[in-house]
Amino acid sequence: MNDVSLRTATSADVPAITRIYAHAVTYGTASFELEPPDEAEMARRQNALLARNFPYIVAELAGAVVGYAYAGPYRDRRAYDWCVEDSLYLAPESHRRGIGRLLLTRLVAESQALGFRQMIAVIGDSANTASIAVHAAVGFRLIGNFQSIGFKHGRWLDTVLMQRALGSGDGAPP
């Protein structure tokens, strides 16, 4: 994917990010949101993560944003400060082209450089084999499943949990 470039997201990317996410919310099961957020809400979410120095990356192809990934807090309790949760979304035409793997690999590297020790993937829908596969390809291992905890598009959905150590992981205190 030599023609794909990765960079830190900016406010100028919010319209494209909003479109990508809206498609995932409306037609997919990767997100358990039922209504797509508007640009103002997506900008608020992006700003909140960037203000806390979490990595937020976009993939560009031919000058257009075709995917994005970010890390955010896993839970809002201090003992979790060394753990992040990843999110990864691609434009529909960008699936199965290696862009997700590029984004996730970069997200792992940036999160590790920031000193985080664990990354968690909370994958909506156990049938989302593409997301499970890309996470496995980047070193995540299956931790478990929550069964039938979401209801969307007329069916019950599982959530798959995957985890990857960053840096020394739990080999030493932070």
PLM regions: where:
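Glycine-rich phosphate/pyrophosphate-binding loop shared by adenosine-nucleotide-utilizing enzymes
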Residues: 4, 64-68, 157
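A short beta-loop-alpha structural element at the N-terminal edge
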Residues: 5-17
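Conserved GNAT-fold acetyl-CoA-binding loop/helix
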Residues: 18-46
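Acetyl-CoA-dependent GNAT
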Residues: 36-93, 104-105, 110, 165-167
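Conserved catalytic-core motifs of GNAT/GCN5-like acyltransferases
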Residues: 70-73, 122-123, 132, 136, ...
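Conserved acetyl-CoA-binding loop-helix of GNAT-fold acetyltransferases
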Residues: 96-111, 133-137
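Conserved GNAT acetyl-CoA-binding A-motif
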Residues: 111-123
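C-terminal "cap" of GNAT-fold acetyltransferases
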Residues: 148-174
